[in-house]
Design a protein with these regions (language model features):
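Short, linear, compositionally biased motifs with a strong N-terminal bias
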Residues: 16, 45-46
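Non-catalytic tandem-repeat scaffold regions and their flanking low-complexity/translocation tails
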Residues: 53-385
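Sec-dependent signal peptide recognition
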Residues: 37-43
Length: 385
């Protein structure tokens, strides 16, 4: 029996499926929805198209290992922080110009626990220091990864990978690099692919880097890699006019969602009424049928970009439930950052605001992790017209 059928074989799930399908038709044809309540479960599956739900592939990998939280390094660096804190308020002192990259990295995390982009350059400097005493770029990378660990939410690691690629003078192979023991001890293949995207952007033109990411057979890998490219070239990627829609329509289909994510994630994140702002973004920007789902994914990330509050997560979930076939993309965008930056209460609150398929997918995405390889079907759906 197909898994999609088995999921709805109980009366409870059948009722949830009816409710979800009728909600998507927005009660515009209530007689039809009312009649659907009398359909058999099998007929209902045909009408509502259960196979259209891009469920996560649980055979792909174990859920992504949650990287160390900033609190881990607060404890690990406790002695260093005590030595470098001011006596009045416990805030960090400035470091002398001669301070090592690692000391500056510790200071950055002391100042900003969820730092990231600031640490890219420090990762490059740490690799350069290690390269002076190592026999090869590969050995220097392994050593640099050991120094960076997951400080600044992986920013140092991403920078070290970029410097490694530059030292070799050739684009790294995603599968080969992400299988290195020094890498797998810190992050999984998904976040490693994102780091490779940073490296490709440093070595190649933006177009070639995105094509390199899109060449990955796994949709998730291509998506995360493209995010690294866009992030690395953020200052120039969207141009002076910042026409996000025009730009993201031109990139390879596998990279569209990453393009919209970085193009739209801050557009509505500071609004007082987040739901209204995201809805306005969808109306204004997500007007192309070709890129609609990818655009909705990017717009939805604004709900939880900065202040990741439980009530905002629930608001976002309720908004996602109004989007019909794009509901799945919206849920993925909403939950994308929560595994790394959100709380369990936030995840539970958002998913509890949904019903049926949407609630199940929400819980699966939240549990899988930010850079999970289980989301191939979900991410692949953004590349479809």
């Amino acid at each position: 029996m197909p898994a999609t059928v088995a999921r709805y074989i109980t009366p409870y799930f059948a009722r949830q499926r009816i409710s979800h399908c009728c909600h998507n038709c927005k009660l515009a044809y209530w007689p039809v929805c009312s009649a659907m309540r009398r359909l058999s479960v099998v007929s209902l599956l045909v009408v509502c198209g259960a196979a259209d739900v891009p469920w996560l592939d649980t055979s792909a990998e174990a859920p992504e290992r949650t990287p160390p939280a900033p609190e881990v390094y607060a404890r690990k660096d406790a002695g260093w922080r005590k030595q470098h804190a001011t006596t009045a308020h416990g805030r960090p002192k400035s470091l002398p110009p001669s301070a090592s990259p690692l000391d500056r990295l510790k200071l950055e995390q002391f100042r900003h626990p969820t730092c990231h982009s600031q640490a890219h350059q420090l990762g490059r400097e740490i690799f350069a220091d290690e390269r002076k005493t190592r026999a090869s770029p590969d050995a220097a990378l392994d050593a640099a990864l050991g120094v960076c660990e997951y400080r600044c939410t992986g920013g140092c690691l991403h920078g070290a990978v970029g410097a490694y690629a530059a030292a070799r003078g050739a684009p790294p192979d995603i599968a080969e690099l992400c299988a290195r023991r020094a890498m797998t001890q810190i992050v999984g293949a998904g976040e490693c692919a994102h780091a490779v995207g940073h490296a490709l952007a440093l070595l190649q033109s933006e177009e070639d880097a995105l094509r390199g990411c899109a060449a990955a057979p796994d949709y998730s890998v291509a998506h995360y890699c493209a995010g690294g490219v866009v992030m690395e070239t953020a200052s120039t990627f969207f141009g002076r006019k910042r026409d996000v829609r025009a730009k993201c329509e031109r990139v390879p289909p596998k990279t569209r969602a990453a393009c919209y994510y970085f193009g739209l994630r801050s557009r509505a994140s500071g609004a007082r009424n987040r739901t209204a702002a995201v809805e306005e973004t969808v109306k204004d920007v997500c007007t192309s049928k070709k890129t609609y789902k990818a655009c909705v994914y990017g717009a939805a990330t604004a709900f939880l970009k900065n202040k990741m509050h439980t009530d905002v997560g629930a608001q976002g979930a309720r908004f996602c439930a109004t989007l019909g076939d794009a509901t799945w993309a919206c849920i993925d965008g909403l939950m994308f950052r929560t595994a790394k930056f959100g709380s369990e209460a936030l995840r539970r609150g958002a998913c509890a605001a949904l019903r049926g398929d949407a609630a199940a997918l929400c819980r699966d995405v939240a549990a899988a992790g930010m850079y999970s390889l289980r989301k191939g079907a979900l991410v692949g759906s953004y590349a479809e017209v």
